[in-house]
């Protein structure tokens, strides 16, 4: 969550989506691996080496060639899905807090349509810091709304910022919205 514009009356935060280096690396590996498995399957069927490495034409088509072809098809289906998410920049968007109009606007890029939430300041109960350490750490800022049990997350998925930065952003936002800050121990 990056603050692009912060003034006395307005805070805007850009949220990064699925265009991350890790997704590009995984997509590249899936592409190469999926095509490699399909070429190995075709090589075992035709008896001609289509890959520069190894000798896949010596594999029996049943069962090794068929299994490698299935792995290749599954890898390429996952690959198409992942590249689609990267292409549309799934999860990207912004958070906008405006003191003049007393409104909050949260917008994210969804799978098939954009997700947009508009709130008034009086609907916000508090700002919550959701911090958990361990094998799968989570550090996110969320809005606790009046009349709802679940908090509305403001941080992007997979963002892992330093603890001090998350605490400072949460405190600044709570002060701006004039609400309590929850989750500090």
UniProtKB/Swiss-Prot annotation:
Is RNA-binding a UniProt keyword of this protein? no
InterPro entries according to UniProt: PSI_Ycf4_assembly
Stretches of the chain forming a coiled coil according to its record: none
Sorted alphabetically, the keyword list is: Membrane, Photosynthesis, Thylakoid, Transmembrane, Transmembrane helix
Membrane topology, as annotated: Multi-pass membrane protein
Q: Could you give one GO CC term from the UniProt record?
A: photosystem I
Superkingdom, natural source:
Bacteria
Q: Which residues cross the membrane?
A: 24-44, 66-86
Q: What is its main location?
A: membrane
For this entry, list what GO says about its biological process.
Answer: photosynthesis
Its annotated compartments are: Cellular thylakoid membrane
Which family does the entry's similarity section mention?
Answer: Belongs to the Ycf4 family.
The free-text function statement in the UniProt record for this protein reads: Seems to be required for the assembly of the photosystem I complex.
Its protein name is Photosystem I assembly protein Ycf4
Organism field: Prochlorococcus marinus (strain MIT 9515)
The lineage is: Bacteria, Bacillati, Cyanobacteriota, Cyanophyceae, Synechococcales
Which gene does this sequence derive from? ycf4
């Amino acid at each position: 969550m990056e603050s692009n514009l912060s003034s006395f009356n307005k805070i805007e935060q850009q949220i990064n989506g699925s265009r991350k280096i890790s997704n590009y690396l995984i997509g590249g590996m899936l592409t190469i691996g999926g095509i490699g498995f399909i070429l190995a399957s075709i090589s075992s069927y035709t008896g001609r080496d289509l890959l520069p490495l190894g000798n896949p034409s010596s594999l029996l088509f049943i069962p090794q060639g068929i299994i490698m072809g299935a792995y290749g098809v599954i890898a390429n289906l996952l690959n198409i899905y992942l590249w689609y998410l990267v292409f549309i920049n799934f999860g990207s968007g912004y958070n906008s807090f405006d003191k003049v109009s007393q409104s909050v606007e949260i917008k994210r890029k969804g799978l098939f349509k954009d997700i947009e939430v508009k709130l008034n300041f009086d609907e916000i109960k508090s700002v919550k810091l959701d911090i958990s350490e361990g094998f799968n750490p989570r550090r996110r800022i969320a809005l606790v709304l009046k009349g709802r049990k679940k908090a509305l997350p403001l941080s992007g998925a997979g963002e892992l910022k330093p603890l001090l930065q998350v605490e400072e952003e949460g405190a600044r936002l709570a002060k701006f919205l004039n609400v309590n800050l929850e989750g500090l121990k």
